[in-house]
Amino acid sequence: MRRCLQLARCGFFGAPPNPMVGAVVVHDGQIIGEGYHIRCGGPHAEVNAINSVKDESLLKDSTVYVSLEPCSHYGKTPPCADLLVSKKVKRVVVGCIDPFAKVQGRGIEKLRSAGIEVTVGVLEEECLELNRRFVTFQSKRRPYVTLKWAQSANGYIAARESGRTHISTPMTQMNSHRLRAMNDVILVGRRTAECDNPSLTTRSWVGKNPLRIVLDRHASLPADLALFNGEAPTLAVTEREYPETRPGVEFFHPDYSMPLLEQLLSELHRRGIQTLLVEGGTKVLQSFIDSGLWDEAFVEHGSIAIDGGVPAPKMPKVSACEPKQFFGGNFIVARNK
């Protein structure tokens, strides 16, 4: 199963919005085939693993290990459970149940109904952790939310004066671009958009630009900001539309008499968006924290001190908090569990 997890990670950029899955075929204690889900819409891990077996006659006496329950429904590809049944494999070992509503145990039931021995829950926590973004999207019906900010040595996120405060180094800024490439959407508030004028693209990292979201209730942001340069699509969360056309901009008009974040996350879920990166500032970040609508946080601790300014967000007590280094910078990575 650990080999399944290794293989699954190879699909990090290609598999989403599908989960990352790895599969291994074992005969008489030897691996005779393996595969992973390479890209969304392509063959699943079990198919690639079965197809890699040179002597198909061995399958009837083989065990197939797979990190996620084989699918049981027709989507872009046929059900993997049907394939395993047709190949008459002897046994299937599953890492974890698929939380997707169209599966959720049905794949395992189909295998057992065909007389195949099935074992479930091997390295279950590791398998769920690997696909935590997919699991959150399916089980909580919202995107997996990652918070990211940099704070000074004395706990400030920005100086008192308007304008950008440079806490990150050019190297640690690459971590921001890495996180952007790993997420479907990036969000900032009106003040950050106006003061920092960020482009919110992945220009210093390989990967697609995320959808940019800006919270601008009164539609007051000027049209010459980098967010409206058309380099990447932008979703403006407002009460009304801007007076002029802005390239690549669409709108979401929530009911401001109701909680905003819940409405926004529900809308992103409806659009099939699985991951959201929140880059601030403090007011926006704190609103996610106070609402409990976050899953992971990357907090860079800079070496400089700021003489007063905007305090960094306050984190609650979390069950998982770990110091890490990225690109020579010191970070705290926290999980909301």
What are these regions (language model features)?
Residues M1-P19, E34, K54, Y144-K337:
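Enzymes that bind and transform nitrogen-containing heteroaromatic metabolites
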Residues G14-A15, G41-G42, I108, V122-A150, ...:
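Proteins enriched for Cys/Gly/acidic motifs involved in redox and nucleic-acid/cofactor modification
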Residues A15-G29:
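N-terminal glycine-rich anion-binding loops that anchor highly charged ligand groups
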Residues V25, Q30-E126, L211:
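Zn2+-dependent cytidine deaminase-like catalytic core
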Residues H27, S139-K140, R335-K337:
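Active-site beta-strand termini and strand-to-loop segments that position acidic
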Residues S62-S72, K140-Q151:
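N-terminal pre-triad scaffold of radical SAM enzymes
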Residues H73-G75, F100-V103, E126-L130, A153-A158, ...:
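Short, well-ordered, mixed-charge alpha-helical segments that flank or form enzyme active sites
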Residues G107-E109, R133-T136, T202-S204, L293:
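Short low-complexity, flexible loop/linker segments enriched in glycine and/or proline
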